[in-house]
Amino acid sequence: MPRHSVFALSILALSITATVWIPTVQAETNLLRREFYGPVNPELFAAFLDDHDARGRENQRDFSSGSGTNELVDELSPVSERETLERFGKRNIDEIDRTAFDNFFKRNLDEIDRVGWSGFVKRLTNYLATTGHGTNTGGPVLTRRFG
């Protein structure tokens, strides 16, 4: 028992140390990044965001693609880049992910419908009667009810 409590306390101490130490390490500025890009001026960053927000609102157009969403058109991008992006059709990712799931259950429901629920119940009662799993007092209870 003492070994268990020592182990639990050591795990607790390690987790507390990691919880305190990791965010402080991640919050420090990377020296390589600071040397490469230079110090970040907050005013420059705010001006950058303002410029891009204004530019985005000016170039926002509504396309009748059926989705009803607005898309940003970049007037400065070359035509070749836009053509490569437009080459791929717009697809709903949820639809793509659901198809395999839906097909699996549709197939199984079709198999049940072919046999019918009455056939399923008869096969279940026959199985339970022959294996003896459906007996309370030694006799086939389900066979007497449904058969």
From Swiss-Prot:
Signal peptide (UniProt feature, chain positions): 1-27
An annotated GO BP: neuropeptide signaling pathway
Cellular component aspect of the GO annotation: extracellular region
Keyword Secreted appears in the UniProt entry: yes
Propeptide: 28-89, 146-147
Alphabetical keyword list: Cleavage on pair of basic residues, Neuropeptide, Secreted, Signal
Family statement drawn from the similarity comment of this UniProt entry: Belongs to the orcokinin family.
Name of the featured protein: Orcokinin peptides
Organism: Apis mellifera (Honeybee)
